[in-house]
Amino acid sequence: MSKAIYIEDNLFDKTIIDNERYTVRVIIKNKNNLFGYIYINGEDIFGYRDHIESAGGGIEEGETDEDAVKREVLEELGCTCKIVAFIGQIVHDFNLLRRRTYANYYYVEVIDENLETNLTSLEKTLFKGIIWKSLVDIKNILNKETSKVGMLVHKRELKAIELYEKYIKKNGGQNE
C-alpha cells in the first residue's frame, strides 16, 4: 500500500485529537462515464454546509472494507457496484470533532442504479441529492469556495481524485 495522504484541519481551531474513525469512501463511475457525489446542504455541528462529497462512511464491526463499500454505495447512492481497485488512504483531522479519520478510497463502477437508498436520520437532513457529472465538472465544483467544513471536505475529495487519476494513468484506463 502506498503512503497515506495526510490533510490537516487548518480551518477550525486546533485541538487535541483523541478519537479515531475508520471509513471507506468511493470514486464511483456509472455507465455514462459520469461520477457520483452527494450534495450536502444544511446545518449541523460544523455550521452551514453547502458542498459535495463522495459516498462512504464508517466500517462496522466485523465488516471488511469491501463489505462496507458495497453497503455505503447502496445506502447512500442507491446503487450496486463492482469494486475495481483500492486507490489509497487519506487521513484527515476534524478539530471540531477531535477526530482523526482514516479513509480508505476505492474506485468502483456502477452495476445497477436507481435502487432505494437507506439513509440515517442525519443523512436525511443533510443529503439533498446525488449528482452525476463529468470529472472535469466535479473538479470545478470542488475548487469553488464554500463553507469551512465544505472546504475541508473538498480538499479531501480533490486528493482522492488525484489518487484515482494516478491509478487510471498507471493502469492505462481512460480518465473522463
Where are these regions (language model features)?
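Short connector loops at helix/strand junctions that flank enzyme active sites
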Residues: R21, R49-S54, T101-A103, T125
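Conserved S-adenosyl-L-methionine
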Residues: V84-G88
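Conserved Nudix-box catalytic region and its N-terminal flanking loop in Nudix hydrolases
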Residues: N30-E75
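Residues embedded in well-ordered beta-strands
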Residues: R25-I27, L34-G36, Y105-Y106
